[in-house]
Amino acid sequence: MELLTFKDVAIEFSPEEWKCLDTSQQNLYRDVMLENYRNLVSLGVSISNPDLVTSLEQRKEPYNLKIHETAARPPAVCSHFTQNLWTVQGIEDSFHKLIPKGHEKRGHENLRKTCKSINECKVQKGGYNRINQCLLTTQKKTIQSNICVKVFHKFSNSNKDKIRYTGDKTFKCKECGKSFHVLSRLTQHKRIHTGENPYTCEECGKAFNWSSILTKHKRIHAREKFYKCEECGKGFTRSSHLTKHKRIHTGEKPYICEKCGKAFNQSSTLNLHKRIHSAQKYYKCEECGKAFKWSSSLNEHKRIHAGEKPFSCEECGNVFTTSSDFAKHKRIHTGEKPYKCEECGKSFNRSTTLTTHKRIHTGEKPYTCEECGKAFNWSSTLNVHKRIHSGKNPYKCEDCGKAFKVFANLHNHKKIHTGEKPYICKQCGKAFKQSSHLNKHKKIHTVDKPYKCKECGKAFKQYSNLPQHKRTHTGGKF
C-alpha cells in the first residue's frame, strides 16, 4: 500500500501569497508544516529532510523553494485556503497510508475510531492544538459527500476575506483615503483614527493596536536580548533595533528627504521630518479644532483645555504644561547656555534666541512693515513699530494715566512713583532706576573715554558730552 509523503500534505506559497499573511499567520504556517513533518516521522515513515523543512526551521522565507511540480496558475489570490480540501474518504485513506504494515500493533489502529459517523467526523491532529483541538467536518464546505475538512480551518473561517490579495488596492479608509491590498491591513489602520488598542500587556498594562507589537513588547519584561552589537556589546530584543543601532557606529544615513536633501538613519524619522514640508496636519483637537502634525503636540495641547500642568520646578515651584517649556525654564536656575554663536562666541539658553541673534551678523530683516516698508530682524520690534502708525499706546500707568507703546517703558516709568532704584553701582553704592543710567554712571569709575572728538582729539566718557564739546569748534552751531 502506497505511503502518504510529505509532498502530499505540504502547502506552497508564492511571494505574493506569502505577503498576504501577517506575522502571526506566517508563524502559524511554520508551526503546522513542521508539525506535519514530525507526525510523519513519528509514525515511522522514512523520509529525507526536505528543503522546505530546513528553511522553516531556520525561519527563512519558504516561497522560493519547490516541493514538487505544480500546474501553472494565474497569480494574485491566496487560493490555498479554498483549494486544499480533503474529503472524508480521502482523510480515511490518507490515515491508512500513514500506517504501513507492522505498525498496527503499535497503537495506530485506533486512528480510524476517532471518526464516529460520516456526518460528524473528527480528525485528531495531535500537535495542531494551536489551531484547533479537532476539525469538525460539519462546519466545512460541502464537496462530493457534502462533508470535507479544510487543512487550515483557522484561516478558512475567520480570516478568509481578510487575507484576500489582489493587484489593486481595493480596501480604502473612509477617514483619510489611504488604500490597502488586504482587508486586515485596513482594519489595523483604522485603529490609528479610533485610538483602539485591543492588545494589553498583562505585566504592565500597556496597550497596543497590533498583536505583533505586543509580542515584541513582552521581551522587555523577559529581558531577552538575542541581538548583540559586536562594536559596543549592547543587546537588543529585536534585530531591526540592532540594525538601526549599527548606523550610530557607521554613520550611515540611508533615508534622504527629496525636498531638502537632509539624511536620516531611520525611515520613521524621515517620515516625521516630511511633515515639515507638508501642510497636512493629521491630529485634530476635538475641543477647539486646532490641528497638529504630531500626536505628541496634540497631547500637550490638550493639557491647555484640561488646565493640566504636570511639570513642576523644584527650585521656584513654577509649573508648566509641556516638558519642553519646563526644560527651557530650568536653564534659568542652572545658567546653562547650550546654544553658541559660531560668529562671535556668544551663548544662549534657547535655540530661538540664537536664531534671532544670528540676524545681527547676517543683516537679515525678515519682518517688514506693510505701511512704510521698514524692515526689522525681530517680530516683536515690528509689532512695536506698527503702533507708530496706529497711534496706539496700550500700556497705561495706573498712577498717572500716562501711556506707552512698549511695556518696558511703562515698567521703568512706574519706578518714578515707587521710588524704586534696583540698579546699584558696586563701586560707590549709588542706585539708579534704569540699567542704562547705571551703565553711564560706571564710566565715571573707569579711565575709558570711548567718545573722541575728531577735530581736537579730546575724549569723553559719555556720548552726551561730545555734542556739547563740538559746539566750541562750530561757534555754538551744531
From Swiss-Prot:
GO terms for molecular function: DNA-binding transcription factor activity, RNA polymerase II-specific; RNA polymerase II cis-regulatory region sequence-specific DNA binding; zinc ion binding. GO terms for cellular component: nucleus. It comes from the Eukaryota. Keywords: DNA-binding, Metal-binding, Nucleus, Repeat, Transcription, Transcription regulation, Zinc, Zinc-finger. It holds the Pfam family KRAB. Residues 4-75 form the KRAB domain. The keyword Cell membrane does not apply. It is found in: Nucleus. InterPro entries: KRAB, KRAB_dom_sf, Znf_C2H2_sf, Znf_C2H2_type. CDD domains: KRAB_A-box. One of its GO terms (biological process) is regulation of DNA-templated transcription. The keyword GTP-binding does not apply. A zinc finger (C2H2-type) spans 171-193, 199-221, 227-249, 255-277, 283-305, 311-333, 339-361, 367-389, 395-417, 423-445, 451-473. May be involved in transcriptional regulation. This is Zinc finger protein 718. It comes from Homo sapiens (Human).
